[in-house]
UniProtKB/Swiss-Prot annotation:
One of its GO terms (molecular function) is RNA binding. Gene3D superfamilies: NusB-like (1.10.940.10). HAMAP family: NusB. This is Transcription antitermination protein NusB. The gene is nusB. GO terms for biological process: DNA-templated transcription termination; transcription antitermination. Keywords: RNA-binding, Transcription, Transcription antitermination, Transcription regulation. Involved in transcription antitermination. Required for transcription of ribosomal RNA (rRNA) genes. Binds specifically to the boxA antiterminator sequence of the ribosomal RNA (rrn) operons. It holds the Pfam family NusB.
Amino acid sequence: MKAISRRRARECTLQALYSWQVSKNDVKEIERYVVTEQDIQDCNISYFHELYIGVISCAEELDKLMIPHLSRNLEKLGYIEHSVLRIALFELTKCNDIPYKVAINEAIELVKIFGAEKSHKFINGVLDKIANQLCVSTNNHIIK
């Protein structure tokens, strides 16, 4: 599977999660909109679906995992930063085929494109702390 297709799936997931947080529209309607109306060229649609539905279904669990590592209240996080952290944490904890370094680097790249100017430093710090907490194994995967 091409890396670009997963990267594009992460971008589409971020856009869908942002829309979901801001609009509170139906999850399936947002997914349908992204798939039919957005530029999904080079996007791995099945990975987009896995991430989007997975992050939403695990949102509370992912938030609980990040809260102890935030330097501010969860409510003070911007929608982009919050969504990027959720995507990365989903990949760290639920996607065994993704090395933890890839999940963290992809999150940093996403927030550099879509987030505030210095958000990548914040995201990197939070994810690094969480990865260490989750006991990173020697084969670059998180031990569950």
